[in-house]
Amino acid sequence: MNWTELSIIINHEAVELATNILENHGSNGVVIEDSDDLINQPEDKYGEIYALKKEDYPDKGVRLKAYFNEMTYDDKLRQQIKDELLNLDELDQHNIQFSEQIIAETDWENEWKNYFHPFRASKKFTIVPSWETYAKEADEELCIELDPGMAFGTGDHPTTSMCLKAIETYVLPQHSVIDVGTGSGILSIASHLIGVKRIKALDIDEMAVSVAKENFRRNHCETLIEAVPGNLLKDETEKFDIVIANILAHIIDEMIEDAYNTLNEGGYFITSGIIKEKYEGIQSHMERVGFKIISEQHDNGWVCLVGQKVSE
């Protein structure tokens, strides 16, 4: 399977909304190459500096790179994305540029290695690419070794980072966890590192399940996490203490009742992938079903909600 890389150069003011548009239309990740980063080359959180190459960045503005399955990226989708971008009030229409290229599946892993380095994703969790060596800064630091492959979920997106923070807060070793839309398996691995013994990881994409299994192996938990293809929670008959879902808002909306029914009394529904424009609707739906909202995180236009199943 090949992938279409859609590259868009836009002004800074439109980056957040443009990223949301690309992800809402199914982009498997968005790379942000900001020309300002060349001026303010940051030191990463664990004390090493990665030199940036001028040729990798636009002369001005921001380059967004979005990745779509070549089989589903057609003229209709291309035009929908372009129309929505051009309708943004924040967009400087005189300086927007579009380009595309095909990336073969065999090139995909190496493409992502250019952007993925160890980083602290939350208070406890550090994400470490499988091809790099990293020394822990503290005994309590929990390292997740990851190769995102085709499934992404590297932990650097605000939704994943917020889910990791929620896992730190609400998941206990005695809990059972089901991770819906596991992707790279990062949230299941985090639950394992917390000490959870019963974890089930679902994804409708069999390739994602395969990538997740490989990441479980890298983190020495392949025999401890059940990874299977699954269509949300529609066929789930088991009960769990924690349901985690970091997926698109409209899919979350479809599964709220099933999440409630899957949880044990007092259990938690940790969910993100929700843009700020849609979170009030998701929150209201959760409350109508019976969830008590106990946590609400916001980060760069994204929201993570935690609802608890409680009886009246």
From Swiss-Prot:
Principal place of residence: cytoplasm
Cellular-component GO terms for this entry: cytoplasm
UniProt keyword Membrane, yes or no: no
Pfam family, one: PrmA
Keywords: Cytoplasm, Methyltransferase, S-adenosyl-L-methionine, Stress response, Transferase
Enzyme Commission designation: 2.1.1.-
Annotated localization: Cytoplasm
Induction annotation: By heat shock.
BP term (GO), one: methylation
Catalysed conversion reaction: L-lysyl-[protein] + 3 S-adenosyl-L-methionine = N(6),N(6),N(6)-trimethyl-L-lysyl-[protein] + 3 S-adenosyl-L-homocysteine + 3 H(+)
Family of this protein: Belongs to the methyltransferase superfamily. PrmA family.
Listed name of the protein: Ribosomal protein L11 methyltransferase
Organism: Staphylococcus aureus
